[in-house]
Swiss-Prot record:
Disulfides per UniProt: none
Signal peptide: none
Entry's Gene Ontology cellular component terms: cytosol
UniProt protein name: UPF0301 protein Noc_0368
Amino acid sequence: MKTMCYFRNHFLIAMPALDDVNFARTVTFICEHNQDGAMGIIINRPLSITLDQMLQHIKVKDCPQEVGEMPVFLGGPIQQERGFVLHRPIGQWETTLRVGDEVGITTSRDILDAITQGKGPPQTLIALGYAGWGPNQLEQELAENAWLSTPANSTVVFDTPYQQRWEAAAALAGVDLSRLSGEIGHA
């Protein structure tokens, strides 16, 4: 009997040879993975809009300047009009999925209202869109060496500057990406 290995609460780190415009040099935080597929949020691709600009589109007003200047990330190529909030601590929100011991992902508006009122989680990453894989698709891409996987670390998500997250996530797996070849092979 074959036992499946799921990657919930893991980072997917794009290998240097991955040249897909949606995923080159990305770190994707896997929020859900089961027999039906996988879903994650890219954590190192900021968009050219701030939280304040995004909130104006959904009619949330009175955003304090320090909150409004937060970057919004491109979470992935699927449903880019849909918002996702990765946060620590998990807290109690209408639609929160616990990803690990420290991190939740929420899609309900109540968390945005709380953030703008200074009552939200102290650490957040706000994204539009998500990355998704169908049944066995992610496993196939891993077998093809498109990705490096390692258990996620919330410090990389919330405390590491986004420009350094690709290298920092790989370092968790003991990999220096600058030393990898762009050639793909199997031993």
